[in-house]
Amino acid sequence: MQPRWVLLVALSVLFLSGRAGALTEGLYCGRQVCYDVLGVSRDANKGDIARAYRQLARKYHPDRYRPGDQLGPDGETRESAQEKFILVATAYETLKDEETRKDYDYMLDHPEEYYRHYYHYYSRRLAPKVDVRIVILVSVCAVSIFQYYSWWSSYNEAINYLATVTKYRIQAMEIAKQQGLLNRTKEKGKNRRSKEEIKSEEEEIIRDIIKNKIDIKGGYQKPQIFDILLFQIILFPYYMFKYISWYVRWIYTFNIQGKEYGEEEKLYLIRKYMKMSQSQFDTLEEHRKNTFLEQKLWIKENYEVYRQEQEEETKKKMASDPRWKRYRRWMKNEGPGRLTFADD
């Protein structure tokens, strides 16, 4: 029987030494076990832990001890009570959170993984407490606001530029005269204004007419609230459903039933072959789109012929361009500069 008792004592010593080795100063409750600090077992639920914390917090709260008193109601000094209150609060913060409690229990059971315990402890303490979803939402809103105002800035720049182009300016002036808008600026008598005021009002009238009459396409088009990132994310399920419906209709109508393409479908195929976005394609003039349709570029073979012709034409233009001639001459005679590490 004696060897069996010796074995049990040895195992108990190893268990206690391992448990003590897991308690490191600076981690959680230091050299004390957080469960023992609160007087609860490792099987205690959140309710038991919260009740134990409230009792001990009332017992050791520093406000119960006056600065001049040597001993408080429970025979504690103000300093010792404050230390115990902090320890109780630390134990509660450790055990009330499920993830932190799992890490702490793992530390008690695996004291040999010293560096892992340090990593998990400080990674949780130093991790930001802000909800990631809030951070993402704020970031999306900030990007959306920046998008919207930058698009308005680009749109106003385009309007200001078009107001200086003679072609559009003359058209806007004619429309303003027909509507009698310019006559109002030339008032007489007491209501007469300076030339600067009249000119400023005329410019504003011209800009307003250009805004209303000219449909700007592409990157300088008038901003739409539903184009910003926030609404694109919100409406993504709708756009996805719309695309799937369109794709299924395309397959059924043209691949299965074999119907001919309409003008909209032909332009879509042409744009797809040209690898242009919708906004880029919209900036093309109508006569160019009509030319594409006349050349039947929605047919892949016709488009390949058109693309090769365009490449040949571009090469001819570059060959006859004086700037490209000078560049080729320079490349042939001198070439680009080179870095060398050779000693002079």
From Swiss-Prot:
InterPro entries: DnaJ_domain, DnaJ_domain_CS, DNAJC25-like, J_dom_sf. Pfam families: DnaJ. Its main location: membrane. Keywords: Chaperone, Membrane, Transmembrane, Transmembrane helix. The chain crosses the membrane at residues 5-25, 134-154, 228-248. It is found in: Membrane. GO terms for biological process: protein folding. The keyword Endoplasmic reticulum does not apply. Residues 33-108 form the J domain. GO terms for cellular component: endoplasmic reticulum membrane. Gene3D superfamilies: DnaJ domain. SUPFAM superfamilies: Chaperone J-domain. PANTHER family: DNAJ HOMOLOG SUBFAMILY C MEMBER 25. Belongs to the DNAJC25 family. This is DnaJ homolog subfamily C member 25. It comes from Xenopus laevis (African clawed frog). The gene is dnajc25.
